Regions:
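Conserved active-site and cofactor/substrate-binding residues in soluble primary-metabolism enzymes
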Residues: 58-65, 88, 92, 162, ...
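Catalytic cores of large soluble enzymes that bind and process phosphate-bearing ligands
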Residues: 55-62, 85, 128, 132, ...
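Active-site loop/helix belt of alpha/beta enzymes
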Residues: 12, 173, 179, 185-306
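A charged N-terminal "starter" segment
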Residues: 2-142, 423, 427
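Active-site anion/phosphate-binding pocket segments in diverse small-molecule metabolic enzymes
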Residues: 241-427
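Active-site-proximal beta-alpha core segment in soluble small-molecule metabolic enzymes
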Residues: 83-228
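Glycine-rich tight-turn/loop motif centered on a GG-T
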Residues: 47-59, 124-127, 145-155, 229-241
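Aromatic/hydrophobic pocket-lining residues that form π-stacking "cages" and hydrophobic walls in ligand
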Residues: 70, 167, 247
């Protein structure tokens, strides 16, 4: 626990100020409530069979629904689906989704995970999702073992001529051939090629070194299209049209200037969870990448993902229930907080805390900005209506998946409110 001095002062002064009549109408309403039937069943299951520590739950019924939503979109266009491994960082989870979706295409972002993927999924096709330092690529080759053939099954993402030169030198030193996918800046402005002259330099270098470099395609990542950009900057449709103009320009340039590099089997990757549905409206790309949309954390509550359902939750037990909020040094004066705010009339200390997550169930729970956050035993406040007791579970919904899923050890897969499997995460 770390008392936030600024919030402490503002909080105590604020309560005092609000006691006067001019602020009475601002008094918070009671936001508390009991578990829904869904979370009541999960609470009972975890109290009976769970480990009584913070866990990350994957709801397989909801995950199935999300996979099917994605696949209906993909099948309408005849494209392929590539799973974003960093957003689904568990071999069991990836395998489950891959089997239901019928795909062995992965996108990897981290050298240790890449080596793991190559060993565990020897039939997979892997595209790097970001350009790795050449030393990371070298470490991949040094530690790689198994039947996975990088020369045929791995695409290195390259963003500029300088990095391509480094990879060429590595390929020459290893006496191997590398498949090169070129990152395009289609409007995200996070690096990648945005100039045809630069693209020409890279394609020329690939064409001049066929023993060590092979052109594998393009990647144009466009999540901003579906992220709710203010309308004054362009509608999703307008932003999407601009993305595809840039992508098409790079494709046309390559076909015209380097026809020997072009063939039908190239990987023309695009999209991302917020924007994959938009690509039903184009036939240029060959595949879309999706990861986070399979689990739909809070930051992906977007109009473009309205058909998706939240499928991942943190569950953690209540360790202590101590009544009305009580702030160190304020002691009895803390009663002002609970008098003013019904949502501070119960205090719970949970196992762990301070995650990238938002309270989900029971409704009306909140962290305490005056007391401060804690990763050990976080104070959580609620009204009398929440009905929590010691060892009941507090449920939170992650704001994102790629970092959060790695923090809890094995994921617990649930179906129909029952624990049915556990899946280790990447390490």
């Amino acid at each position: 626990m770390a008392v936030n001095r600024r919030n402490f002062v503002l909080g105590t002064l604020g309560v005092g100020a609000l006691l006067v009549g001019v602020g009475a109408w601002l008094r918070p309403g009671d936001r508390g409530g009991l578990y829904s039937e869904y979370f009541r069943a999960l609470n009972n299951e975890l109290k009976a069979k769970g480990p009584m520590r913070p866990v990350l739950l994957i709801d397989l019924d909801r995950l199935d629904h999300n996979i099917d939503v994605v696949m209906r979109s993909v099948k309408r266009t005849g494209k392929h689906l590539r799973l974003v491994e960093k957003s689904l960082p568990s071999p069991g989870l990836l395998s489950y989704i891959g089997q239901r979706a019928g795909t062995q295409r992965l996108m990897s972002f981290h050298q240790p995970f890449l080596n793991h993927d190559a060993q565990v999924y020897p039939q997979s096709d892997i595209l790097l999702g970001k350009p790795l330092p050449v030393r990371s690529a070298e470490l991949f080759y040094q530690t790689h073992k198994g039947p996975f053939d990088p020369a045929k099954q791995l695409q290195w993402l390259i963003d500029n001529p300088e990095r391509l030169q480094q990879y060429l030198a590595l390929a020459q030193g290893l006496s191997t051939r590398m498949r090169i996918n070129i990152e395009l800046d289609v409007g995200l402005h996070r690096g990648g090629v945005s100039d045809l002259n630069v693209l020409g330099q890279m394609l020329a270098l690939i064409a001049a070194n066929p023993q060590h470099l092979e052109f594998a395609g393009f990647m144009g990542y466009d999540p901003f299209v579906g992220m709710g950009v203010p309308g004054m900057l362009g509608s999703p449709e307008e932003l999407f049209a601009k993305v595809m103009v840039i992508y098409q320009r790079c494709v046309d340039f390559t076909r015209q200037q380097y026809p020997a590099l072009w063939h039908d089997g190239l990987c023309l990757n695009t999209a991302g969870s917020p924007s994959y549905r938009m690509h039903e409206n184009e036939n240029l790309s060959s595949e879309v990448s999706v990861g986070t949309a399979m689990l739909k954390p809070t930051h992906y509550d977007l109009p473009s993902l309205v058909e998706h359902e939240p499928a991942a939750y943190i569950a953690t037990p209540v360790l202590k229930s101590t009544g009305a909020v009580n702030i160190p040094a304020l002691d009895d004066k803390s009663k002002l907080f609970s008098w003013w705010d019904a949502n501070q009339r119960q205090t719970f200390f949970i196992y762990g805390g301070n995650w990238m997550a938002e309270f989900e169930s029971p409704p009306g729970l909140q962290s305490n900005g005056v007391y401060g956050r804690s990763s050990n035993q976080e104070m959580v406040n609620g009204s009398n209506a929440v009905g929590l007791t010691v060892e009941d579970q507090v449920f939170l919904r992650p704001t994102q998946t790629e970092a959060v899923l790695l923090q809890f050890g094995d994921l617990l897969a649930v179906r129909g409110g029952k624990i049915v499997d556990s899946w280790p995460v990447y390490t």
